[in-house]
Design a protein with these regions (language model features):
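Predominantly extracellular beta-rich ligand-binding scaffolds that present long acidic/polar faces
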Residues: 1-195
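Short, recurring structural edge motifs at helix starts
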Residues: 12, 45, 79, 203-207, ...
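Short, low-complexity cationic-aromatic patches
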Residues: 17-18, 209-214, 241
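N-terminal start and proteolytic maturation junction detector
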Residues: 108, 150-153, 168, 206, ...
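Secondary-structure transition/turn motif
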Residues: 191-194, 221, 253-254
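Solvent-exposed, low-complexity, repeat-rich "mucin-like" stalks and linkers
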Residues: 195-226
């Protein structure tokens, strides 16, 4: 007969982050212990499958995955995402993320990475390559590669020793003081309420069809030094029910 096969996707925050999805500023300390049936599977500390953007997220938990009798079926396991994919010319981005946990996989056909277990062919073969999709991301020395299943190079980020992880200077491209700080346990964490002295929207006008939303809202310049992507939850006053020009309001941390 006819049927649909749904591949399981597990994540500390979401099973799948779709093309328009942005997972921003999340920390997962979740310990995952999974026994998976023999079928293609994706497991990540933040998302099982990422087709959108995961930005400024930290995963510190332990991920244990076991698959028995699954020689023909791949298991993709990552500290942040099990797999990253593009759709058309967009998505599949991991930016400014850290994995500081441990990953253990028992499976005959597995791909494991501290950022993602695997990157889809359309990511590796894109004009930006892997370096354009995994940006300023860091993992722990001795715990495997950042991206599994490929020898493709990454231009930014890398693996850090325990001592380097506790040093803010190790995280090139991260804004400490306004956006990040080193926590009491020695790892980076987001600054919840930094003193905000100025906010500036950096974007030209954008457009969308009636009844839809723009896929990109622009960026905020915070205190004249730090950029942050504007996400849909920051927007108010948006109305696309009719043609015309509209102004929206952006709220960032109560400002």
């Amino acid at each position: 007969g006819n049927g649909t096969v749904v591949y399981p996707e597990f994540g500390g925050i979401a099973g799948e982050n779709a093309l328009a999805g942005i997972i921003f500023g999340c920390t997962s300390k979740l310990n995952v212990n999974l026994t998976i049936a023999p079928m293609k599977s994706r497991v990540g500390g933040i998302a099982g499958l990422n087709i959108g953007t995961i930005s400024k997220c930290v995963s510190t938990g332990t991920i244990r995955v076991t698959q028995t009798n699954g020689n023909e079926y791949p298991v993709y396991v990552g500290g942040i995402a099990g797999e990253i994919q593009k759709f058309g010319g967009m998505g599949g981005v991991l930016k400014e993320c850290l994995h500081a946990g441990k990953i253990t996989v028992t499976a005959a056909n597995n791909r494991v990475g501290q950022m993602c277990g695997t990157a889809a062919d359309n990511v590796l073969s894109s004009s930006y390559g892997l370096s354009g999709h995994v940006l300023n991301c860091y993992g722990k020395s001795g715990e495997g590669n950042l991206v599994g299943g490929t020898d493709a190079s990454i231009g930014t980020g890398g693996l850090l020793t325990e001592a380097q992880m506790k040093d803010s200077k190790s995280y090139v491209g991260w804004e400490f003081g306004t956006d990040w700080k080193i926590s009491e346990d020695g790892l980076p964490e987001r600054v919840e309420n930094p003193e905000i002295t100025s906010l500036e929207v950096k974007n030209n006008w954008t457009s969308c069809y009636v009844g839809e939303k723009p896929w990109y809202w622009g960026r905020l310049l915070i205190n004249g030094t730090t950029y942050s992507e504007i996400t849909a939850d920051m927007i108010s006053g948006f109305d696309s029910s009719a043609e015309g020009t509209t102004h929206v309001y952006v709220e960032y941390k109560g400002k």
